[in-house]
């Protein structure tokens, strides 16, 4: 018997279709023959998902790999830089041209092959992009080319070592880097250790001023502009700001103003690796004179000079170069994270503002047309609402038409890829709808808050159904969207094999459209289909007496709650084992468990070594070894400082409660544990009410709706969870998303 089976989902990318990542053959020397048409831009899956969900992304250039240093040091540094970005909670996007395809986010084998290619790869600036792409060549991108491709993908922050600039003697040679011109017309923040010190820093700053490029140094007022190898040059920085957050505010203002210029963010070289400015100047002058004598010009000057400095400094310049690149990546990640928060909270900022290859100014009405978090909603939106007594439970999320196909016979692998006899059923569903319906059937005053599209057939059916039902609801109509739909394929026992969900419309529901519906609620439940910004607004805007319940819905959608957990805590989460694993790993990778406040909170729970001895007794008494074998308890303890109550749905094995609150109605028995710090752990086995399983879809939703309704009516925790499991079991035995008979459990 399987009580809990959350529905799968199809993630709908906001990246323009032509820019989605194409399948690549693991051999980078072969053309991609799997694609029907050639796309100039390929985003990795990791970068695509990050951009779609407003996870901070940091672009990284690749000339440092192809032309910056020899193999294998170049590959080692590239891996270190990406690891640094990830450790700071951002997603790295190394950019390069592979077989002519502009690739945003390299796989490990691609990074390795590029590092091995070295200077046989092209050094690609703006002028080289079309040639290298058309000839299907490999290339490392300079600052200019990386900016262009980052902007096309919608990446706002780019970390590098140092930018190009005005070469010494440029009054005669006219040797001025394209990086400076690009900064004047491509809106990407370039985080670097200033300008490469082999260049003319003073004239470079003058050109940047002419191009209208803001130049800001991370540091106190009137900071010196850094000189790459040296922490300070003899030139004062045009602007100075003391924290990454202040710099992010500046970048966000640049976006709001609709400017298309980039920003140069200068990061002073760390003290421990900085080289004395005067000593480095003398060494550079010697090397420059030698380059003139040898006739080295153009784009060959910089790599030659860096090689000479490495030799003359006996390796110190390389060590400094590596340290400053890692330092820049760290600071860029912090800035990107702060900028992502600002974008998430903004009332008009879209999730992805990439422009394709054209870097034309983005019209302001494009921004304002986006449904926002707390901003003013469009007056063109039609809102249909039922009115009744104030709702104690409000469920925010999807309402859909669910199609369930149950196979007549067992499925074997040799019969995949063909049709099978089955029985089909259609019903109205959606996670929030099912939770609301279950809550209403259990006697709680409940309201569903959702939206429907105007361009799909199911819309009229959904509206008609809700109008005739007794379920209170607020439905927002959105033009040019399709309503939610869900299709599940179950095996002959009713267990889910595969499902597809089209819930894209829910990403466009805004807080301003529904905030009045939340005022009277004791419990606000939302599913994983709504946007991270709406989750954040609901959580941060609720009153102190209101409780928030998050139903993850699926593994990928579980990660939407990270934006909330970075700034606030939530009251309840109801993951299954897979969703718990996904959330734990993401928080671990995002360094949620590294700050001092987390340690202090965890220590206050009193989870000592003696308590772990109690866990062994607890495991034996419950007979559920997976609680410890799969690390479920340990993962929940890690999450507890962020989430007050965690109910892990164990499918046929029942449910597990972990709470940091003093709960009502939790009786002590052999299946319960209590720490000195008021942490409660209790296992709830499955009630013996299940006959023949028919349909697992909706069982988890029924559990949560019933559980929340009973809490709102003052039930204790034990009774609420036991009854919710019985309700889920009744739904398992029918073809409805919620079995109407669950109301008999109140008798």
UniProtKB/Swiss-Prot annotation:
SUPFAM superfamilies: Indigoidine synthase A-like (SSF110581), Ribokinase-like (SSF53613). Its cofactor is Mn(2+). Signal peptide: none annotated. GO terms for cellular component: cytoplasm. The keyword Ubl conjugation does not apply. Residues 380-747 are annotated as: Pseudouridine kinase. InterPro entries: Carboh/pur_kinase_PfkB_CS, Indigdn_synthA-like, PfkB_dom, PsuG, Ribokinase-like. This is Pseudouridine-metabolizing bifunctional protein C1861.05. It comes from Schizosaccharomyces pombe (strain 972 / ATCC 24843).
């Amino acid at each position: 018997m399987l009580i809990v089976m959350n529905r799968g989902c199809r993630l709908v990318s906001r990246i323009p279709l032509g820019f989605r990542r194409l399948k690549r053959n693991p051999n980078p020397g072969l053309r991609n023959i799997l694609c029907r048409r050639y796309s100039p831009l390929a985003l990795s899956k990791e970068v695509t998902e990050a951009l779609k969900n407003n996870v901070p992304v940091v672009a990284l250039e690749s000339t440092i790999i192809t032309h910056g240093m020899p193999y294998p040091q170049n590959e080692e540094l590239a891996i270190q830089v990406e690891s640094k970005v990830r450790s700071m909670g951002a997603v790295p996007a190394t950019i390069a041209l592979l077989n002519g395809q502009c690739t945003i986010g390299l796989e490990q084998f691609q990074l390795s092959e590029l590092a091995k290619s070295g200077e046989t790869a092209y050094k690609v600036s703006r002028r080289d992009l079309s040639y290298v792409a058309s000839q299907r060549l490999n290339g490392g991108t300079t600052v200019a080319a990386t900016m262009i491709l980052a902007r096309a993908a919608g990446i706002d922050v780019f970390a590098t070592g140092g930018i190009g600039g005005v070469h010494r003697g440029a009054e005669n040679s006219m040797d001025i880097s394209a990086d400076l011109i690009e900064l004047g017309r491509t809106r990407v923040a370039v985080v670097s250790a200033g300008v490469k010190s082999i260049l003319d820093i003073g004239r470079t700053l003058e050109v940047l001023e002419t191009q209208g490029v803001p130049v800001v140094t991370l540091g106190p007022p009137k900071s010196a502009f850094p000189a790459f190898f040296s922490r300070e040059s003899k030139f004062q920085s045009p602007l100075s700001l003391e924290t990454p957050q202040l710099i992010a505010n500046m970048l966000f203002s640049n976006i709001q103003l609709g400017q298309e210029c980039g920003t140069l963010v200068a990061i002073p070289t760390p003290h421990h690796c900085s080289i004395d400015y005067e000593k480095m100047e003398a060494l550079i002058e010697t090397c420059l004179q030698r380059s003139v004598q040898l006739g080295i010009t153009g784009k060959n000057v910089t790599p030659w000079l860096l090689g000479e400095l490495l030799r003359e400094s006996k390796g110190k310049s390389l060590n400094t170069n590596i340290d400053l690149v890692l330092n820049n990546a760290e600071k860029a990640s912090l800035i990107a994270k702060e900028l992502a928060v600002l974008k998430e909270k903004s009332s008009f900022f879209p999730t992805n503002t990439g422009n394709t290859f054209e870097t034309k100014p983005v019209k302001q009405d494009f921004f304002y047309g986006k449904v926002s978090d707390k901003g003013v909603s469009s007056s063109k939106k039609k809102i249909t609402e039922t009115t009744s007594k104030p709702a104690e439970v409000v469920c925010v999320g999807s309402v859909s038409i669910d199609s369930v196909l149950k196979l007549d016979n067992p499925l074997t692998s040799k019969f995949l890829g063909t049709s099978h006899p089955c029985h089909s059923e259609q019903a109205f569903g959606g996670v929030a709808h099912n939770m609301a319906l279950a809550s209403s059937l259990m006697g709680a005053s409940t309201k569903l808050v959702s939206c429907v599209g105007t361009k799909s057939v199911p819309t009229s059916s959904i509206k008609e159904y809700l109008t005739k039902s007794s379920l209170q609801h607020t439905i927002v109509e959105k033009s040019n969207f399709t309503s939610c739909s869900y299709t599940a394929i179950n095996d002959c026992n009713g267990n889910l094999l595969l499902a597809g969900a089209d819930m894209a419309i829910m990403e466009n529901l805004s807080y301003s459209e529904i905030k009045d519906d939340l005022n009277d609620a004791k419990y606000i439940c939302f599913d994983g289909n709504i946007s991270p910004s709406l989750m954040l607004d609901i959580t941060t805007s609720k009153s102190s007496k209101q409780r928030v319940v998050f139903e993850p819905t699926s593994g990928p959608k579980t990660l939407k709650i990270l934006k909330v957990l970075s700034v606030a805590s939530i009251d309840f989460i109801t993951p299954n084992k897979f969703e718990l694993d996904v959330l734990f790993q993401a928080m671990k990778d995002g360094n949620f468990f590294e700050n001092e406040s987390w340690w202090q909170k965890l220590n206050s729970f009193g989870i000592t070594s003696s308590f772990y001895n109690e866990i062994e007794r607890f495991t034996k008494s419950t007979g559920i070894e997976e609680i410890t074998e799969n690390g479920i308890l340990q993962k929940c303890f890690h999450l507890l400082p962020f989430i007050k109550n965690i109910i892990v749905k164990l499918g046929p094995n029942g449910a597990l409660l972990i709470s940091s609150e003093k709960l009502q109605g939790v009786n002590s028995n052999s299946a319960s544990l209590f720490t000195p710090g008021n942490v409660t752990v209790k296992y709830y086995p499955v009630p013996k009410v299940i006959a023949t399983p028919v349909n697992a879809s909706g069982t988890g939703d029924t559990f949560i709706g019933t559980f929340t309704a009973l809490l709102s009516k003052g039930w204790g925790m034990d009774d609420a969870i036991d009854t919710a499991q019985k309700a889920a079991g009744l739904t398992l035995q029918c073809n409805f998303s919620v079995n109407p008979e669950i109301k008999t459990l109140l008798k």
